[in-house]
């Protein structure tokens, strides 16, 4: 069974074609600047990587270009589009309507439109991708896999905010959490690495990248997570503030004489690593400037480590027993320095640290010492494979 995985943004398409018999990637690529005359198309299948620049009018044209590349006599990996059994779509927000992956129907699409207000930057683009795939691949059923679904198992005491209850009842204002597909994938891999059934394992999974979140996973189920109603809450991120006193917002608006859109832009695009450091939103550059002794880079790094450590401590209290801590995402997988800084301060959990094992980037391994009471792991995430698995399972069992 071959599954095409699509992750559509407002002007982009990221895609992979996977063979689920071997769970191998047959082709991978992306389309950027959709709707522009200088759209960028990238494809890597059989042979060398292809990059083209030209007009791609819309997402449907983009998907059709992907299919043309996949079936190309020289660079293609399939002979006909009909070999694609189904299309798995990343959808950012499922709200309370979707607590697991679903086969896409007209009713599902109607409900997705009703959820636009919960994720105005992402869900409309995700639906555009769904419609584009239906137009280009009418034979292939679609499956929606939601970033929020893994966190649907959180108890009410964890997801409700202490606001007037009418805000929840009337507007569904609550903690939803994100990065669920990544947290689900690495928690399953962590149980495999530990050689234990997932149902018996308590984990703290740390997805650290430009967007970052941490999740308490009890027996394979999310019981708490750092992101909230939006992906703005929790850890310090590339350009997002993470947790902050809500009272700061009206104060800044009054002092700076700015409106909702300006403060929203500040919190989402100009805060976090970039805002504190004044250098970059990229952790690699922060670490480079740290080595040169830049005080703001040092302070940014220390704040990030401190915030994550606070969450790990809190989630250890939530879980009662921690069997494993997982680092994933761009920073989690590729920054030995940050992992070391965090782990050196986790002695209260019985964590010991293997510096030699930690000296790796993008490799799956255990980096805690042999006498550590908690296994600390680096597990490269694979959201596309997780989406493909969920898609294949639904298609097989429908």
From Swiss-Prot:
Q: Where in the cell is it found?
A: Cytoplasm
Catalytic activities: acetate + ATP = acetyl phosphate + ADP
Gene Ontology process terms (BP): acetate metabolic process; acetyl-CoA biosynthetic process
Question: What top-level branch of life does the organism fall under?
Answer: Bacteria
Residue positions annotated to bind substrate are 90
Pathway where it operates: Metabolic intermediate biosynthesis; acetyl-CoA biosynthesis; acetyl-CoA from acetate: step 1/2
Site description Transition state stabilizer, residues in chain? 179, 240
Q: Report the top EC class in one word.
A: transferase
Q: GO CC annotation: what is one?
A: cytoplasm
Q: Name a GO molecular-function annotation.
A: magnesium ion binding
The positions annotated for binding ATP are 14, 207-211, 282-284, 330-334
E.C. numbers = 2.7.2.1
Q: Which residues form the active site?
A: 147 (proton donor/acceptor)
Q: Which UniProt keywords apply?
A: ATP-binding, Cytoplasm, Kinase, Magnesium, Metal-binding, Nucleotide-binding, Transferase
Q: Which cofactor does it need?
A: Mg(2+); Mn(2+)
Q: How is the cofactor bound?
A: Mg(2+). Can also accept Mn(2+).
Q: Which NCBIfam families match?
A: ackA
Protein family membership: Belongs to the acetokinase family.
How does this protein assemble? Homodimer.
What task does this protein carry out? Catalyzes the formation of acetyl phosphate from acetate and ATP. Can also catalyze the reverse reaction.
Q: What is this protein called?
A: Acetate kinase
The source organism is Symbiobacterium thermophilum (strain DSM 24528 / JCM 14929 / IAM 14863 / T)
Gene behind this chain?
A: ackA
């Amino acid at each position: 069974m071959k599954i095409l995985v699509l992750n559509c943004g407002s002007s982009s398409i990221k895609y992979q074609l996977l063979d689920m018999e071997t769970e191998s990637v047959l082709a991978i690529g992306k389309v950027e600047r959709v709707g522009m005359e200088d759209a960028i198309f990238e494809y890597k299948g059989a042979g060398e990587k292809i990059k083209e620049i030209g007009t791609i009018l819309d997402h449907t044209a983009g998907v059709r270009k992907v299919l043309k590349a996949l079936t190309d006599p020289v660079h293609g990996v399939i002979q006909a589009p009909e070999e694609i059994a189904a299309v798995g779509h990343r959808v950012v927000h499922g709200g309370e309507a979707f607590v697991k992956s679903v086969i896409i129907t007209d009713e599902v699409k109607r409900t997705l439109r009703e959820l636009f207000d919960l994720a105005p930057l992402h869900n409309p683009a995700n639906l555009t991708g769904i419609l584009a795939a239906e137009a280009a691949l009418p034979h292939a059923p679609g499956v929606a896999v939601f970033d929020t679904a893994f966190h649907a198992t959180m108890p009410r005491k964890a997801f409700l905010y202490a606001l007037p209850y009418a805000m929840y009842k009337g507007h569904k204002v609550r903690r939803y959490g994100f990065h669920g597909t990544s947290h689900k994938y690495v928690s399953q891999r962590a149980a495999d690495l530990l050689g234990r059934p997932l149902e018996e394992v308590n984990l703290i999974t740390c997805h650290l990248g430009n967007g970052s979140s941490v999740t308490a996973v009890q027996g394979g189920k999310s019981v708490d997570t750092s992101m909230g109603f939006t992906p703005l809450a929790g850890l310090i991120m590339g350009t997002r503030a993470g947790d902050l006193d809500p009272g700061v917002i009206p104060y800044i608006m009054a002092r700076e004489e700015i409106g909702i859109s300006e403060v929203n832009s500040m919190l989402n695009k100009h805060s976090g690593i970039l805002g504190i450091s004044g250098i970059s939103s990229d952790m690699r550059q922060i670490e480079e400037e740290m080595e040169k002794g830049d005080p703001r880079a040092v302070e940014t790094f220390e704040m990030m480590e401190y915030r994550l450590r606070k969450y790990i401590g809190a989630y250890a209290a939530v879980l009662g027993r921690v069997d494993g801590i997982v680092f994933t995402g761009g920073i989690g997988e590729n920054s030995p320095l940050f992992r070391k800084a965090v782990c050196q301060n986790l002695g209260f959990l019985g964590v010991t640290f293997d510096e030699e094992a930690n000296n790796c980037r993008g490799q799956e391994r255990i980096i805690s010492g042999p006498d550590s009471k908690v296994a600390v792991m680096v597990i490269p995430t694979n959201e596309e494979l997780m989406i493909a698995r969920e898609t294949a399972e639904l298609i097989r069992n429908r």
